[in-house]
């Protein structure tokens, strides 16, 4: 009770993503770590958030996963659960000296590693030993309610296993839909991203309820039966545009020479483990001569060489005909260049048009604002004093200065730090994610988007800051008045690197012809541990052919 670990508890806040919490609990249990849950909301005097903020009077919701640090493996628990481990000043001084002298580093591995951020689960650290009103933690018991006479059956889209459920049913040639807006049917709440299977879509499928129940049992996933398709009030009804039909993905991974065996392996593992469906591997050496028509989705893992002209031309034509191309890390950077595929660019290639990218960023931010001057909207007199996003009082930097800064700041890129990602809450690729997503960031490309290119995840979370009386210029972007930007969550992230990647895009999507190109700045399945951003990747892989491309009609 007198150790440095005695008065500390780690809390994974209650979430409907039972599959992900169960996966974390299994790993903790394998180490003999004791876990508990609260049977009622629990108020604590203070807690530290994953963004490092100290909050007072925090209420821990019922059903949270609580891990007291006061138990036999206390040092291990702290090592794998604490949000932000300190690095000695002497180490930081030597690290910075090395970076500036010759670009070398003391850091041989990622400097940020804790379970809650890797798994993308919201959590807090409570500076006290929690033991009252708790009981041993048990995984949620699935309720498989499959009525044979129901008109439809659904699983919760907040749970990662819902993606596997959809993928496996489509492997059986069952028609599957996904809901892109939350609704209530038959008194049952259906979240965004919920998988929806109807009897009407599958009139010739024998034993449909039995197949649904069997797959749910395999995944230990709850299923709800729906008896009425009328949404409560103005909520979506079955038959409306929000119940979107999926297409069965036919997946290939580029591999062999020129690709990272780590990323190829973790991509392969993610498909096998999280989805359990078939896929193919294509030798990149034969890409320009391969028949790509059999695939609807191609994944390009992190690679060490850019694709050649004939290879790019083959992929470009395939995308235009309706393919979904997903690329990681350096492979994504090789596509995001002049002569690549699409119009997304890396920061270094976009600074000549910095103001255009900043205006696109401001439009995104304004699109989420709920502030409105009703008097200005309702006036009959023309008001010439219109506020424009490029006229906030801050002075933009010249292209020359931006390039000079980018060259300098790129020296300080991390070896593996956690940064805060803000998520587009309306995009189909963000099913099952919150508004903030921890991102593992290293020496990797930072992307820029504008016009019709979409940023599903950007770096940095805006928070209210009453002291920020003026807009602030951060390299190419502008932070609005009254806002502050939080970037670092955990690990070593030099201020120069934080400024460089602030507001850049981590996940992008661009429509090209009938198909789409989806770029991930990093490796979304890093060592099989980044479950948060991994969910975005699973959405792209399984839902992309149905939600992001034009349907193919075979006559």
Where are these regions (language model features)?
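Intrinsic-disorder/low-complexity accessory segments
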Residues: 1-555
């Amino acid at each position: 009770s007198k150790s440095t670990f005695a008065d500390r508890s780690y809390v994974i806040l209650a979430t409907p993503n039972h599959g992900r919490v169960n996966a974390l609990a299994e790993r903790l249990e394998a180490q003999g770590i004791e876990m508990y849950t609260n049977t009622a909301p629990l108020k604590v005097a203070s807690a530290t958030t994953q963004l490092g903020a100290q909050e007072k009077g925090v209420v821990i919701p019922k059903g949270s996963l609580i891990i007291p640090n006061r138990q036999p493996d206390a040092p291990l628990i702290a090592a794998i659960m604490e949000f932000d481990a300190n690095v000695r000043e002497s180490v930081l001084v030597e690290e910075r000296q090395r970076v500036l002298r010759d670009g070398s580093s003391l850091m041989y591995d990622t400097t940020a590693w804790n379970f809650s951020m890797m798994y993308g689960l919201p959590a807090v650290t409570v500076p006290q030993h929690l033991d009252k009103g708790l009981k041993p933690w048990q995984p949620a018991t699935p309720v498989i309610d499959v009525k044979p006479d129901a008109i439809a059956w659904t699983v919760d889209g907040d749970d990662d296993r819902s993606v596997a459920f959809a993928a496996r049913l489509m492997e059986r040639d069952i028609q599957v839909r996904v809901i892109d807006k939350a609704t209530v049917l038959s008194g049952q709440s259906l979240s965004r991203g919920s998988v929806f299977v109807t009897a009407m879509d599958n009139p010739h499928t024998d034993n449909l309820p039995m197949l649904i129940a069997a797959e749910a049992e395999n995944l230990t996933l709850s299923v709800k039966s729906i008896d009425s398709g009328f949404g409560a009030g103005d909520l979506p009804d079955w038959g409306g545009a929000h119940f979107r039909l999926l297409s069965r993905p036919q997946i290939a991974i580029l591999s062999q020479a020129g690709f990272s065996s780590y990323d190829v392996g973790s991509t392969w593992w993610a498909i096998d483990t999280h989805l359990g469906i078939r896929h193919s591997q294509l030798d990149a050496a034969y890409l320009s001569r391969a028949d790509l028509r059999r695939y609807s989705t191609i994944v390009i893992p992190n690679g060490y060489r850019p694709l050649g002209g004939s290879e790019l031309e083959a992929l470009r034509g395939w995308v235009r005909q309706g393919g979904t191309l997903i690329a990681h890390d350096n492979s994504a950077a090789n596509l995001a260049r002049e002569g690549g595929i699409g119009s997304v660019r890396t920061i270094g290639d976009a600074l000549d048009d910095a103001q255009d990218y900043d205006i696109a960023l401001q439009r995104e931010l304004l699109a989420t604002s709920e502030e409105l001057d009703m008097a200005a909207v309702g006036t009959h007199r023309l008001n010439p004093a219109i506020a424009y996003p490029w006229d906030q009082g801050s002075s933009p930097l010249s292209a020359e200065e931006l390039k000079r800064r980018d060259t300098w700041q790129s020296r300080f890129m991390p070896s593996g730090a956690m940064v805060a990602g803000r998520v587009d809450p309306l995009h189909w690729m963000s099913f099952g994610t919150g508004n903030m997503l921890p991102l593992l960031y290293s020496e990797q490309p930072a992307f820029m988007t504008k016009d019709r290119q979409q940023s599903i995840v950007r770096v940095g979370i805006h928070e209210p800051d009453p002291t920020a009386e003026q807009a602030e210029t951060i390299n190419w972007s502008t932070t609005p008045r009254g806002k502050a930007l939080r970037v670092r969550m955990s690990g070593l992230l030099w201020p120069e690197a934080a400024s460089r990647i602030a507001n850049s895009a981590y996940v992008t999507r661009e429509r090209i012809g009938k198909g789409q190109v989806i770029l991930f700045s990093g490796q979304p399945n890093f060592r099989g541990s980044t479950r948060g951003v991994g969910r975005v990747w699973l959405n792209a892989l399984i839902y992309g052919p149905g939600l992001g491309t034009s349907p193919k009609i075979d006559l």
